[in-house]
């Protein structure tokens, strides 16, 4: 039986009360042209609505620049919650018992990051991905008790990270040794590495994916390092870990320390920051882990609570013997990352990673067919890739910008041997129309 709430008599009585003679008169403010619309477009999800509104912005440019900072769709709820007064601070509380809500959130963040990386322990965050890598190198030397003062660093590690790493560790008499990458594959040549003398080295850094977007042979590199008594420091993109093998499962024993940039997890691009670094490690090394650690415990009445644990490692307890001088960390960004991961869940994060990879592969294939554009490396990629241009890369970037496209990151300064190399990034924010616009713009220039 159909549910009909109002009979014709009911409608007439209601119209009489409000002084309208008919339904048409009641809705006379609606333009008559709209009355004959037969088709209403299908509904959009939040990401679709965001893209629709951004297209109406006259100066909005399509951004295909990655190089360590990535544009992903961030649900509106993330920062709506993160900027509530209860969370809106960068500080980790010193008096743990006074801020149980904040500590519980950080504890949940640590749990999710440890699970995502398949590691035992996570800290509460570090300043950014570059300083996290430097902290990981210092941690490796401490674990080796200073007997090894050399860190092996592939040239395929983010060049900005390498500069920060060198600036910090070389002041402590730790040598950074650069390992060249294979010019055709874009990754560490594992066969050449096997012939390398690893004596006196504390650790090797393994990026995944590397700066070129290529996927390193992580299992082979990890097993080689452990066979030569080196620690393995994994520097990873957290979004990629939703698709790829997590560092804790690399090789036979897994990575020893994992670090990286947390910006892809719900933190928007903002002229370089603030972002946040993350770090995880094996349980055996937790006392050398820098930064705050939140633990779960019970009080004397048996009630569950959260507290800052292992504080003897930190500078506010023993400054001269602290594992680091990380003070405020990036608590607010961690709040956003926790909300982001909670909203997306494992399935949602995997969908973001898969969409980024799929769209990147699509653009790679499109550009491979453009005259004057050639792929540089043959290794599998995640969501970035390198092409070589016939024309000077600066001219191409300027011409693309005039057409509303930030086309990528020039490799000319950091990797001059690659010539007119261009690093291009594609994420889940890019549609098929965006990829076509990039292809057509590049064809018109080349």
Curated annotation (Swiss-Prot):
Catalytic activity: N(6)-[(R)-lipoyl]-L-lysyl-[glycine-cleavage complex H protein] + glycine + H(+) = N(6)-[(R)-S(8)-aminomethyldihydrolipoyl]-L-lysyl-[glycine-cleavage complex H protein] + CO2
Record's subunit section: The glycine cleavage system is composed of four proteins: P, T, L and H. In this organism, the P 'protein' is a heterodimer of two subunits.
Native source species: Coxiella burnetii (strain RSA 493 / Nine Mile phase I)
Gene3D superfamilies according to UniProt: Aspartate Aminotransferase, domain 1 (3.90.1150.10), Type I PLP-dependent aspartate aminotransferase-like (Major domain) (3.40.640.10)
Entry keyword annotation includes Oxidoreductase: yes
A single BP term in Gene Ontology: glycine decarboxylation via glycine cleavage system
Keywords, sorted A to Z: Oxidoreductase
GO molecular function, one term: glycine dehydrogenase (decarboxylating) activity
Cross-referenced SUPFAM superfamilies: PLP-dependent transferases
Similarity remark: Belongs to the GcvP family. N-terminal subunit subfamily.
InterPro entries tied to this protein: GcvPA, GDC-P_N, GDC_P, PyrdxlP-dep_Trfase, PyrdxlP-dep_Trfase_major, PyrdxlP-dep_Trfase_small
Root EC class: oxidoreductase
Keyword flag Oxidoreductase: yes
Name of this chain's protein: Probable glycine dehydrogenase (decarboxylating) subunit 1
